[in-house]
């Protein structure tokens, strides 16, 4: 199926929709402008009109998309919850505007540190993956949920997934708690240094006093 200007669908069950698009692999789909599945079966590619350079697919059963002004995905009808991949960005950013949030509760940083210290950590791979090349670091969702899944008002996450926004939040809370510990240690060290300097001054004064007394006693003899 080919629909649009210079749209070509050259193989079995291939679909091309748009302008200057080519679906040249079996069961492949090309949509938008200036994209091609490049003969790779089962692949899909979508492109905007920001360029006249054709974006090609490089693998079978793969997906490629080009949108020069980014991607915006929403998970509610009001479009207030979701994630952005902005223009020229290389990572997704979660919507985090304070004006879109409510029911704020403070978090005990020391409690978070304790929970992290008690949480099992592993290296692991998903079932069926190559153990030599596809290993990972990190906790299990069940352990993370057991430690941080409730906050006094409701549930946070579930016991099979780890939300990266929550994971980042826990890490920042822990870092803040460690910074408070570090600041307290620095203050204690500063006070200890002051006391040590005063003690040294007193010792020096006593030594000088003893020296003068010994000198006086020597003259009396």
Language-model region placement:
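Glycine-rich, acidic and aromatic/proline-enriched surface loops and short helix-turn segments
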Residues: 118-121, 141-151
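Glycine-rich, low-complexity segments
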Residues: 65, 69-106, 110-113, 180-184, ...
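Active-site-adjacent substrate-recognition loops and nearby beta-strands
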Residues: 53-58, 96-106, 122-135
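Stable alpha-helical elements in mature extracytoplasmic
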Residues: 100, 112-115, 140, 171
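C-terminal intramolecular chaperone/auto-processing assembly modules
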Residues: 150, 154-221
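Acidic, glycine-rich loop-and-strand cores that form catalytic or ligand-binding grooves
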Residues: 111-126
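Periodic small-residue-enriched repeat registers in elongated scaffold domains
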Residues: 1-84
């Amino acid at each position: 199926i080919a629909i649009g200007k210079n749209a070509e669908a050259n193989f079995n069950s291939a679909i091309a929709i748009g302008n200057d698009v080519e679906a040249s692999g079996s069961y492949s789909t090309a949509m938008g402008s200036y994209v091609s599945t490049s003969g790779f079966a089962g692949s899909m590619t979508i492109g905007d009109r920001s360029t006249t350079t054709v974006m090609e697919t490089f693998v079978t059963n793969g997906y490629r998309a080009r949108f020069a002004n980014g991607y915006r995905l929403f998970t509610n009808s009001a479009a207030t919850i979701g994630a952005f991949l902005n223009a020229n960005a290389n990572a997704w950013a979660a919507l985090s505007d304070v004006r879109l949030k409510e029911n704020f509760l403070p978090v005990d940083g020391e409690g978070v540190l304790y929970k992290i210290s008690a949480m099992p950590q592993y290296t692991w791979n998903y079932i069926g993956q190559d153990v030599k090349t596809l290993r990972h670091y990190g906790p299990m969702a069940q352990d993370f949920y057991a430690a941080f899944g409730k906050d006094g008002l409701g549930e946070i996450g579930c016991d099979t997934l780890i939300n990266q926004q929550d994971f980042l939040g826990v890490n920042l809370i822990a870092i803040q708690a460690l910074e408070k510990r570090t600041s307290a240690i620095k203050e204690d060290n500063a006070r200890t240094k002051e006391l040590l300097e005063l003690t040294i001054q007193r010792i020096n004064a006593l030594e000088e006093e003893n020296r003068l007394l010994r000198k006086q006693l020597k003259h009396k003899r």
